[in-house]
Amino acid sequence: MKRFGILSAMICSLLVPGLASSGAAREKYHDPGLKKVIQIAIVVRDIETASRRWAEVLGMPVPEIRTTRPGHEVKMTYRGRPSDGQAKLTFFNLGQVVLELIQPVGEGTSWKEILDKRGEGVHHLGFQVVDPDKASQSLEREGFPVIHKGRYDSDDGTYIYFDSQKSLGVLIEALHSDGRK
């Protein structure tokens, strides 16, 4: 039952503006600060093919595809251990939400793990957070441990994936931009 509390809070915060910021909601659900979905990410085996197809469906140009820096350069960890994993990424800006396509490169990432276990499909919902430590504490208290984290390639923020697959069917990502370079 506890695991459904956070899902209820997230759905309510999306559907009923102001509810999640009320004192009652914060107290009952430990308010992890997941107020705004900014990203839906899909893991794929072939990012070139997938990005062309998504561009056709969305009626948009194919965005640039880039390869992330090796994990050791961005302080990446996977399941608590340093990782040198990488990914090819592309982003479709859809207004208030970004569609991210991810093709894992190498081992040691949640991207590769989920692609191997479940095949192509939704990897995570990305939420913008103000306080990543608060989000981590709250989500871990809900039973969602950190599975994978690191810094942006631009070194001006962090991403943290929480293992919420079993009860929510998808990972939760907390995205925090700290503005430093």
Kindly give the residue locations of the regions a language model identified.
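Bacterial N-terminal signal peptides that target proteins for export
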Residues: M1-S8
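Bacterial N-terminal signal peptides
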Residues: S8-G18
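Boundary at the C-terminal end of the N-terminal hydrophobic targeting segment
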Residues: A20-A25
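Vicinal oxygen chelate
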Residues: R26-H30, V37-R45, L89-V97, I114-D131, D133-K181
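Catalytic phosphate/metal-binding cores of nucleic-acid and nucleotide-processing enzymes, i.e., regions
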Residues: L34
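Amphipathic alpha-helical segments
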Residues: D46-P61, A135-E142
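A cross-kingdom feature marking solvent-exposed beta-strand/loop segments within repeated
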Residues: T67-G80, D84, E107-L115, V122, ...
